[in-house]
Amino acid sequence: MTDHRPNIGKLTKRGSIQMLFLTGILLIFSGCFTTKSVSQNATTFTVANNTAVYDSVPDDSLTIALIKPYKATMEAQMSEYIATIDSPFSNAFFVGNLGRLAADYMLLSANAISIKEFGVPCHFAISNNGGFRTGFYPGPVTMQQLFEVMPFENELVLVQLPGIFVDSLFQYIAQLQGTPASGFLMSYSKGNTRKDNRYQSLKLNAQPVNSIQDLLNPQYTQPLDTRRDYLIAVNSYMVVGGDGFTMLKHAKKIHYTGINLRTVLAQQLKAEYEANKFIDPRKQIRIYHEPQ
């Protein structure tokens, strides 16, 4: 597996348009205050006089003309139709079906990449719940809603993690009492505190995930083998230890796909809807508390 890091200086078409649009906004605000510098000994203070902007203040025609083409292009992109959903996808912490949907799509995309690039399947996918900011509601889903749900520029990443650290990963998930997940079924017991929680049973999906049906009808039969490595789909925030996933920093190899998670969600939502005219509500239990 190669450690492929994308050129972060290279902007996508959508990113370029956004940056130019924001530049135009900054130009508007640049005329909203005046400053002067006052020096005292070696220290320089900047005094700003703010100018209130009301509806009565006329628009700047040059700024409007500058922004107009980028604004029109962005509005067209944000209104792009993706799919239609029949049931809500909630951002309930740890256990929401929005997280299960996103993790499913991460695994489906990651498996296609891992088979093509490395000749082996991706075993499972996890995400951090903090990457989602709202949910989906019944009705049409547009690109604008995807930006509202996932506003961050995290990308899909594949990590090759030794089994001993995979064990630590599942132990941490037990302490969290769940996380967006796909490709495994796990139970955990509660201790006096969350740090005392322990995962009790774990079964990994025994089949490669090549289709939506593989996701919806998994074969949870494989136990964890700490003597081997696992290929896991995560995001670029988690791979550097974000949200406490520090065990991922022990990955033997890391493959940055260069694909934004929002793009993954858009592509897979569209594919599932075009195939089935329906988005499964993802009500399947994947991580659950084992009563004592």
Describe the function of each predicted region.
Residues 1-14:
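N-terminal secretory signal peptides that target proteins for export/translocation
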Residues 34-55, 100-103, 107-292:
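Feature captures C-terminal
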Residues 76-93, 245-251:
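Acidic/histidine-rich, surface-exposed loop or edge segments in extracytoplasmic proteins
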Residues 13-25:
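Sec-dependent N-terminal signal peptides
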Residues 56, 61, 84-88, 168:
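Coil residues (strongly favoring Ser/Thr
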Residues 41-77:
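Start-of-domain marker
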Residues 28-31:
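C-terminal motif of bacterial Sec signal peptides marking the signal peptidase cleavage site
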